[in-house]
Curated annotation (Swiss-Prot):
Keywords: Heme, Iron, Metal-binding, Oxygen transport, Transport. Belongs to the globin family. Red blood cells. Heme b binds at residues 63, 92. GO terms for cellular component: blood microparticle; haptoglobin-hemoglobin complex; hemoglobin complex. This fish has five hemoglobins: Hb C, Hb O, Hb 1, Hb 2 and Hb 3. Hb 0 presents the strongest Bohr effect while Hb 1 presents the weakest Bohr effect. The keyword Iron applies. The keyword Iron applies. Residues 2-146 form the Globin domain. This is Hemoglobin subunit beta-0. Signal peptide: none annotated.
């Protein structure tokens, strides 16, 4: 993947401004509410029966934060995201048996949460850079499935 200077700067800027303890939980909670079939991967998290229960679930919050910290690795290794996520791809495919389509759903939820946080600063150009980055992440996480 070729990154422009604008794309690199935009991705680094977005992640430097994200409040991981807010955005991570909000993203995973949104995914679990909007796409309830994704809850099957989180059965050990306990009560996921309502949007309120999901939003207040400490394990959802913790894992949402973990996901964002995982994205830090991609931000720091934009030229080699596929290899950066090789082990994570194996984990999700072979051990956790996560449907790779769910990575795209989570990426879409993150885009919505980030757009809401950034407001008018999340211009079309910024969104294009962010979605390109997330598409590479999603592809890399799904790599083991192919």
């Amino acid at each position: 993947v070729e990154w422009t200077d604008f794309e690199r700067a935009t991705i680094k800027d977005i992640f430097s401004k994200l409040e991981y303890d807010v955005v991570g939980p909000a993203t995973l909670a949104r995914c679990l509410v909007v796409y309830p079939w994704t809850q099957r991967y989180f059965a050990k998290f306990g009560n996921l029966y309502t949007a309120t229960a999901i939003a207040e679930n400490a394990m959802v919050s913790k894992h949402g934060i973990t996901i964002l910290h995982g994205l830090d690795r991609a931000v720091k290794n934009m030229d080699d995201i596929k290899n950066t996520y090789a082990e994570l791809s194996v984990l999700h495919s072979e051990k956790l048996h996560v449907d790779p389509d769910n990575f795209k759903l989570l990426a879409d939820c993150l885009t919505i949460v980030v757009a809401a946080r950034f407001g008018s600063a999340f211009t079309g150009e910024v969104q294009a850079a962010f979605e390109k980055f997330m598409a590479v992440v999603v592809s890399s996480l799904g790599r083991q499935y192919h």
